């Protein structure tokens, strides 16, 4: 394993952050984007990799009807324009854990990062699931609490943080 570190920026997409998002996505967009961008620049300035992951559902009628967000080929699935893009490392996933994407998993295995920091959306969703997945890599796993949104209540958030800590994730 190398001494290289990586930041994984998860699901910072229009459908979750823009003004026309569904009401269930109640994030404080300016605050979250600012925190994520600060982390992006910190990692880049230190010479570490920044990796972007987007939740993408296949563009089929049932997904449009029943899910209604992050549909492949729609503007809602695109990375939110205020997120700073500092690398070409972008991966799509269909499930909450980014490690379920073979392309992503193979990339991460090839890079052999010693430490992985996760931020983005959502603590009780894809960011939390990816943190769990990352614990199986042998790398140190950190979840940036300040740069990770959570649309769920404090009780559910605390339960997820406790679960992640029990798996060895550091919450900072």
Regions found by a protein language model. Give the residues of each.
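Alpha-helical structural elements
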Residues: 13, 47, 60-61, 108
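Short, basic/glycine-rich phosphate-binding loops at helix/coil junctions
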Residues: 16-19, 56-63, 79-90
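A short alpha/beta connector and helix-capping loop motif
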Residues: 3, 21-56
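Active-site-adjacent betaalpha module
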Residues: 1-6, 34-46, 67-172
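Catalytic metal-binding/acid-base residues of hydrolase active sites
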Residues: 13-15, 56-58, 96, 122
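A short, flexible beta-alpha/helix-coil linker loop
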Residues: 15, 22-23, 148
